[in-house]
Amino acid sequence: MSTGDSFETRFEKIDNLLRDPKSEVNSDCLLDGLDALVYDLDFPALRKNKNIDNFLSRYKDTINKIRDLRMKAEDYEVVKVIGRGAFGEVQLVRHKSTRKVYAMKLLSKFEMIKRSDSAFFWEERDIMAFANSPWVVQLFYAFQDDRYLYMVMEYMPGGDLVNLMSNYDVPEKWARFYTAEVVLALDAIHSMGFIHRDVKPDNMLLDKSGHLKLADFGTCMKMNKEGMVRCDTAVGTPDYISPEVLKSQGGDGYYGRECDWWSVGVFLYEMLVGDTPFYADSLVGTYSKIMNHKNSLTFPDDNDISKEAKNLICAFLTDREVRLGRNGVEEIKRHLFFKNDQWAWETLRDTVAPVVPDLSSDIDTSNFDDLEEDKGDEETFPIPKAFVGNQLPFVGFTYYSNRRYLSPANPNDNRTSSNVDKSLQENLQKTIYKLEEQLHNEMQLKDEMEQKCRTSNIKLDKIMKELDEEGNQRRNLESTVSQIEKEKMLLQHRINEYQRKAEQENEKRRNVENEVSTLKDQLEDLKKVSQNSQLANEKLAQLQKQLEEANDLLRTESDTAVRLRKSHTEMSKSISQLESLNRELQERNRILENSKSQTDKDYYQLQAVLEAERRDRGHDSEMIGDLQARITSLQEEVKHLKYNLERMEGERKEAQDMLNHSEKEKNNLEIDLNYKLKSLQQRLEQEVNEHKVTKARLTDKHQSIEEAKSVAMCEMEKKLKEEREAREKAENRVVQIEKQCSMLDVDLKQSQQKLEHLTENKERMEDEVKNLTLQLEQESNKRLLLQNELKTQAFEADNLKGLEKQMKQEINTLLEAKRLLEFELAQLTKQYRGNEGQMRELQDQLEAEQYFSTLYKTQVKELKEEIEEKNRENLKKIQELQNEKETLATQLDLAETKAESEQLARGLLEEQYFELTQESKKAASRNRQEITDKDHAVSRLEETNSILTKDIELLRKENEELTDKMRKSEEEYKLQKEEEISNLKATYEKNINTERTLKTQAVNKLAEIMNRKDFKIDKKKANTQDLRKKEKENRKLQLELNQEREKFNQMVVKHQKELNDMQAQLVEECTHRNELQMQLASKESDIEQLRAKLSDLSDSTSVASFPSADETDPNLPESRIEGWLSVPNRGNIKRYGWKKQYVVVSSKKILFYNDEQDKEQSNPSMVLDIDKLFHVRPVTQGDVYRAETEEIPKIFQILYANEGECRKDVEVEPVQQAEKTNFQNHKGHEFIPTLYHFPANCEACAKPLWHVFKPPPALECRRCHVKCHRDHLDKKEDLISPCKVSYDVTSARDMLLLACSQDEQKKWVTHLVKKIPKNPPSGFVRASPRTLSTRSTANQSFRKVVKNTSGKTS
């Protein structure tokens, strides 16, 4: 500043510095400084200094007054705590005087100074305060006291995007919308000169209209002039951090804004798939996948993701040199993924969001999780004995968005300030503040009006949709009426049919009555005959034979008379029933006619209702037009209001005299607006109520029509059913009467014969029923077997489908090659026409090709015969092996039975020994004899035991020989198959090459002929007849060529089928071999257990020797261990949790069973060789940061070779070529630089190795996972022990196991550590660093732990 300036200009510049909110010496900053000094000096030990005491006595009272006047936490009432982190919490608050709702963030000064991170909040404050962007959460106020920093921000009631993704399955349409909003928000932050560096769904909040805003700017960093950032620590969340940020740890990190676009790609993938693309259970796994992103980025097959979305994700998740967005945000906006018909980039904020939060009030917190109360003790600054300055780092933090302590600078005012009264200036300043508050309120009212207009538009759309639905309902009603008419016609037709059937029934009834009358006449005749017979009996009383015959005749006649009487009574009953049925039919006919008339009346009523509905619909359409006109008028009034507001602001700036007039106009406008709004709302409510009434009336009418229709239909159906039942009863009764009449003519003898016949039939039918029940049981058993076979066939079909897909791909490649060949042939055929000499040469070539094809056929036949012979030999070998296996199984069963018998004998001997011991107390002599007998029995048992052990050893040797034979035969079979396939491929390639050479020769010859001069001259002289002959010959040759092609294609299809069959057989044999190996391993463990029991038996039965506990057999295997452990389900703990399995550890194998039933059936799901075991260790929180904290002490990790694993349903994983990672070799370790944000200690010096924000540089061995400070290696300190693991990382696998308790975990770890072989497995020599892949690179990723470390770090 030049000293020549006047005092007024100097004062004016100072005044501008004091007013500027971005200045470091503004009024708020100076007040913060005085406040901080008073806080830091007001202690008894410091007040002993006179200067400090005088300063405090002078300024303490005024500072206390200023503290009461400035904004403080007591000005707000807390509604609810909606978030909590490491430095404090976020509260939903309401201002006591204005009753406005805000989100207030509290940051503990003690925690920030303790963790030496007292500068991260400045960027957050500046971005939210000065962003002036709709995509960034706005900061209204920032203030402080002696314990906390307070940031009063706008409340986002929609919650974060994590909550949205957990409640909805996000479709691609929604993902496009939210990704576009994130892109615009990041562009706003980049335009301010900052990089966010922690873009994730947790930091994306939704406002009340469902639109997105970015928050949490604590990781932001200012860019230099080149748009780059230099940082030596990696900042961010592990799943969203970019490779260039990870590489910056412990080194010179230099990157730009493209690191934020990487996080956008991860966010888009997570929305569409449901999980992050580089998910792993450990930080090391996540870090290695991010560094190897070219190979580890994959898309699931079951998700329907568009090509544009995949392209955009791949463009984001790539190297920073070619990443989308490196050259500006415009290239992102031009991507095809963002093309749509619903919104544009310029109007994205004005469009309706996919999810608008349903809020009950302005303090609705339904989209936030309920948090428990923080019961921990809050730490504060200790009382210092000397000046510390704890409050000085926070000077200047205070900020007010709409408050100024000083008047606005104006040179004219400064010149005339001496003439203006101070009281007038103060009054004007107050009026300006009031106007600013009123303006702020007017802006809020304007926003509310716009929101109400949007809601009214939405309601109108809903009303239109409801009207359309009502129109559809009316159409449905009309269709139902037409259906009712059709049904009425059908019912009329049915009534006519029923009348006709009733007439037929009447005729039948008349016929039955005639038959009854004839039966009566017959009865009277029979009575007369009986009377005559009685007279004859009186006259011929002398003859006994005639009397007896007459008596017999009387008996029979009396029986027939009784039957006829019974039949007569039954006929009379049936006639009466038929008459009653006829009456009922007549009544039903009358009821049907009445119902028909009723349906006609209902139909006419429905027509009248439909006409009334049509009139109401026209009236509703007119009302909708009126509403639309009113809405347009409302929109015009809103525009007029906006124009008035702008005019008022201009008038306020021009002159202060017009302020009173503008206030009056504004008040009038407010009254008018409120009155119009109320009137419009009342009209809308009236119209909505009218619409609801009309809709209810329509629904009631529709329901009454449907109910009447359903009642009529039910009555008609009931009547029809009753008529049908009555008709069936009548017909049955008529049939019974006819049968009874016919039974009168049948004799008793015939009935007896029929009875006997029926009894025989009954017995025969019972036998048949028994046979059928047996057949049914057999069929059910067969059905169960068929179901099991179907399951196995379905499993095989799935495998065959996978093979079919692979073969289809190969066929497609062959077809493409074939198409290319056909295209070349087509070109050749075009050139053939019109060439006599060329045709002769082509004929020669065709003959040569035919000769080659015949040779090819003969070769194929020979190969097929050889393959069939080899297949037969292999089948024979397999059958022999199976027979040997069955014999071994029988021998094993015999051995088990022998062992059981020996166990029984041992039990008997133990009982005898117990009795002998009791009797030994009574008599010593008897005891000696029994001891001698028992010694003999023990000797016998020992002999049998030795025989059994020899048998078991022989069986084990035979088993090993068989397994060796199996392996050798499988290897030979594989080699033979590979040789056959290679020979076939070679023959095919030779044939293709010969054909290609022939074709190239033909093309070259054609070119030579065409380029000859003689040919050109002869071509001119050629006649038309020659040309025709050539064309005919060409056609013949073309036909022959087509035939040869078809034959060739048929041969290719045949060979392809044979190859498919062979590959399917190979897969089946491999799966069968794996199952056999796993079953053998389980059987071996069972045999081992039996041997251990036998050894225990021999030890316990040897009474004479009584060996001590220390004298054990060194040849016996170590003690087994078995129990329940949990493994990661589907390899993903976060989504699927843990899966329980029963684990058995024998001397050679580790067996995993799904349950105990599988263990009994010797059916393991996975088997590991103990010889291939490398390392066993407990895990730390950094290894499994996805797991719960209480589970970490129960988890341990095992490392083993790929070759030592055998599991069911093995899927061959593609070998990924990973990028080379830099690691340091030291004492066999392969150290990778990393940082720890979770609790971890150095294993060399036992000091802390972690920090939440600035952890020290660390190293971790990717073999044995030893952790240490980097300084130990840099300073060459001899504190690190050599690496305990010696294996190739690329050929090893690891597995996490969860025990039931911490003691169980220790037991498993100690047992498995003893099982690890001292020498590394064969074939696993330590690899050099250059040849190692980075498939399991152990680098740690970093996370800004705010939520997870709350309460843990103090």
From Swiss-Prot:
Residues 1118-1317 form the PH domain. Residues 1101-1120, 1333-1354 are annotated as: Disordered. Residues 341-409 form the AGC-kinase C-terminal domain. Activated by RHOA binding. Its main location: cytoplasm. The keyword Ion transport does not apply. A zinc finger (Phorbol-ester/DAG-type) spans 1228-1283. The modification Phosphoserine is found at residues 1105, 1108, 1328. The active site is at 198 (proton acceptor). InterPro entries: AGC-kinase_C, C1-like_sf, HR1_rho-bd, Kinase-like_dom_sf, PE/DAG-bd, PH-like_dom_sf, PH_domain, Prot_kinase_dom. The keyword Cell membrane applies. Residues 76-338 form the Protein kinase domain. Residues 707-946 are annotated as: SHROOM3 binding. Belongs to the protein kinase superfamily. AGC Ser/Thr protein kinase family. This is Rho-associated protein kinase 1. It comes from Oryctolagus cuniculus (Rabbit). The gene is ROCK1.
